[in-house]
């Protein structure tokens, strides 16, 4: 009988000199794929919005409310999803999340097949609301996985890569969804994305495990992660050996929530993320409609043009993470290494206002691309969450951050709908979006001081 020795079972001195595995990058690749589908599902309505409005006679204000349905549910479900993540872990909760949001996306393909137009509008609102609830654990789970699998000096790049999936989704899926809508009808967009997501949920369960439990991880990689600040032990601490309640589940009480909400640094981070997401939700909801209505593009052309700023956003997102981690490796403080890309990138994104002063379609796309590039550079909020979240409450902390950030998904689509409906143009809407970028700069320069991990006080201390 042959004895096989796992790399993790090697003597300590041999394990340290052994070439470390790179399983964390495969986990990051999985996060990227899941987040890409996540954002593709969010963007379905922006691509199919024009034919849906025409089919059911929906006015701009009503469309704004339908756009916001996702975010109403997404925000309300954040704290419960944070508790679930800290109680049961990212692997199981995220798998359930992927399956459910994909099932609800699939159900949207049946809207309008029977009943009145009013019923179809109500059903669309309800299904978007359900998708919002199901997707709520996604980004807090991403942050929890990154905090567990990556050391501090790699965390900015890892967070930027999974966050850049939103732009990659626009690059790949916006033209694809526009083509499906043009060639086969908008119902097919929801049908095929829903089926793809159901399959992905089972793949996630098969591939993703906690660092300490993954059979392909050797001791050298575990030590690299843990000694660099990765919370490899926290990923499994939430599960007791007999299923008893853990520290991760006990922390989800209002006593701890109040501590997080009273922290000046976190308040500034929450405000900044809200304003960043105003730009995000403009691109996710109204941007294709802006290109069709204000710039006279066809739906198919708008779908392809949407991908160009998204490419720039993707490149900016990866560059921002690499720049931040590069500064840390060169001895720059964590605070400056995170703030420099965020402040610089969001200042650059204000060029979106310039679209009000040009007539050329080419210049509009260029300005939007520069704005999206800046937003990508500045989208390091999830790296900041991984840097600052209390070790025993990463899921809860990420959920609070995501809850405040995605309040913009409620406010921005409705506000833009009113601005467009009242004025008949998108000029005021673009100023509104650009000013939110300015508030992000203010928040990180004035409100957020030192960026550091929060230490919670416990009642029995």
Show where each model-derived region lies:
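Extracytoplasmic gate region of multi-pass secondary transporters
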Residues: 45-47, 258-318, 378, 382, ...
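Central cavity-lining transmembrane alpha-helices of secondary-active solute carriers
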Residues: 68-83, 307-320
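Hydrophobic core of transmembrane alpha-helices in multi-pass small-molecule transporters
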Residues: 104, 117-137, 362-376
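Cytoplasmic helix-loop-helix junction between adjacent transmembrane helices
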Residues: 127-166
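Helix-loop-helix hairpin linking two adjacent transmembrane segments in secondary transporters
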Residues: 162-215
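C-terminal transmembrane helical hairpin of 12-TM major facilitator-type secondary transporters
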Residues: 335-381
């Amino acid at each position: 009988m042959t004895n096989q020795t796992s790399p993790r079972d090697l003597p300590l001195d041999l394990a340290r000199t052994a070439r470390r595995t790179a399983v964390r990058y495969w986990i990051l690749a999985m996060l990227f794929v899941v987040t890409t589908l996540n954002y593709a599902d969010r963007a379905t309505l922006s691509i199919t919005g024009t034919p849906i409005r025409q089919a059911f006679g929906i006015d701009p204000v009503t469309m704004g409310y339908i756009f916001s349905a996702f975010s109403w549910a997404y925000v309300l479900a954040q704290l419960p999803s944070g508790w679930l993540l800290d109680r049961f872990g990212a692997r199981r909760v995220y798998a359930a999340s992927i399956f459910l949001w994909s099932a609800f996306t699939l159900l949207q393909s049946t809207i309008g097949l029977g009943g009145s137009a009013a019923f179809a509008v109500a059903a669309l609102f309800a299904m978007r609301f359900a998708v919002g609830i199901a997707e709520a654990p996604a980004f807090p789970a991403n942050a929890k996985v990154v905090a567990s699998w990556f050391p501090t000096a790699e965390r900015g790049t890892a967070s930027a890569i999974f966050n850049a999936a939103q732009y990659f989704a626009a690059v790949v899926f916006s033209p694809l969804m526009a083509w499906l809508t043009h060639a086969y009808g908008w119902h097919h967009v929801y049908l095929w994305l829903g089926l793809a997501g159901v399959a992905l949920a089972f793949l996630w369960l098969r591939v993703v495990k906690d660092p300490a439990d993954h059979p392909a991880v050797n001791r050298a990689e575990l030590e690299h992660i843990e000694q660099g600040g990765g919370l490899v032990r926290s990923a499994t601490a939430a599960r007791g050996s007999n299923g008893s309640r853990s520290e991760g589940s006990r922390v989800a009480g209002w006593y701890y929530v109040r501590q997080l909400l009273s922290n000046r640094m976190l308040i500034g981070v929450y405000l900044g993320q809200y304003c960043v997401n105003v730009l995000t939700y403009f691109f996710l909801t109204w941007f294709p409609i802006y290109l069709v209505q204000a710039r006279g593009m066809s739906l198919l052309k708008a779908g392809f043009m949407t991908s160009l700023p998204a490419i720039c956003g993707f490149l900016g997102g990866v560059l921002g993470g690499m720049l931040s981690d590069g500064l840390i490796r060169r001895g720059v403080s964590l605070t400056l290494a995170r703030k420099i890309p965020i402040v610089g990138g969001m200042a650059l994104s204000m060029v979106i206002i310039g679209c009000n002063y040009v007539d050329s379609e080419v210049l509009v796309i260029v300005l939007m691309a520069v704005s999206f590039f800046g937003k990508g550079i500045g989208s390091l909020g999830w790296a900041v969450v991984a840097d600052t979240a209390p070790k025993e409450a990463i899921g809860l902390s990420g959920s609070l951050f995501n809850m405040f950030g995605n309040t913009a998904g409620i406010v921005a689509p409705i506000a833009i709908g009113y601005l467009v409906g009242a004025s008949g143009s998108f000029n005021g809407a673009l100023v509104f979006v650009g000013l939110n970028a300015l508030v992000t700069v203010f928040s990180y320069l004035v409100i957020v001081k030192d960026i550091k991990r929060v230490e919670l006080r416990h009642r029995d201390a």
